[in-house]
Regions:
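Bacterial signal peptide processing site
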Residues: 17-20
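Short, intrinsically disordered low-complexity segments
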Residues: 65-100, 124-127, 131
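Short glycine-/aliphatic-rich beta-strand segments at the starts of folded cytosolic domains
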Residues: 30-47
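A short amphipathic beta-strand at an alpha->beta junction
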Residues: 109-124
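Short amphipathic alpha-helix segments
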Residues: 49-70, 101
Length: 131
């Protein structure tokens, strides 16, 4: 009887097995690519931190600049380096903002490299240790 009981239990267990078809695991949507910046302002460091005075000047200008609709701070590095990604509605306005911030960037700095650039690649930057 024991073999018969085992056979019955085995048949019952097989009959109770799930017949559901496994579904593929859904993959998450790809991460959103950051929107292109109309103007990018970069604050770097030569080992002494970013140029805080310049950061304050640029932030003060941006606080009163109506043509800039969005400022996205993108940190990187280990010494508080970061980029500001500026959104400006019109290309002509972006160029004006670019030139105004470019006028704030010092021509030379042995402390911290800073730059402002347009998507076209046009850039105004400090000359520093490598120059």
């Amino acid at each position: 009887m024991r073999p018969a009981a085992c056979a019955i239990v085995g048949l019952l267990a097989a009959g109770c097995a799930s017949t559901a078809v496994s579904q593929p695991t859904p993959t998450p949507p790809p991460a959103a690519t950051p929107a292109a910046c109309s103007v990018t302002v970069s604050f770097g460091s030569y080992g002494m931190g970013v140029d805080r005075a310049l950061v304050r000047q640029v932030e003060a200008y941006l606080a009163d600049e109506p043509r800039v609709s969005k400022v996205d701070r993108r940190p990187h590095g280990r010494e508080d380096e970061f980029d500001l990604c500026l959104t400006v509605a019109r290309e002509a306005a972006a160029r004006a903002v670019f030139l105004r911030i470019g006028a704030l960037i010092p021509a030379r700095s042995d402390r911290a490299p800073s730059s402002v650039s347009l998507p076209s690649g046009e850039t105004i930057r400090t000359q520093g240790l490598s120059a």
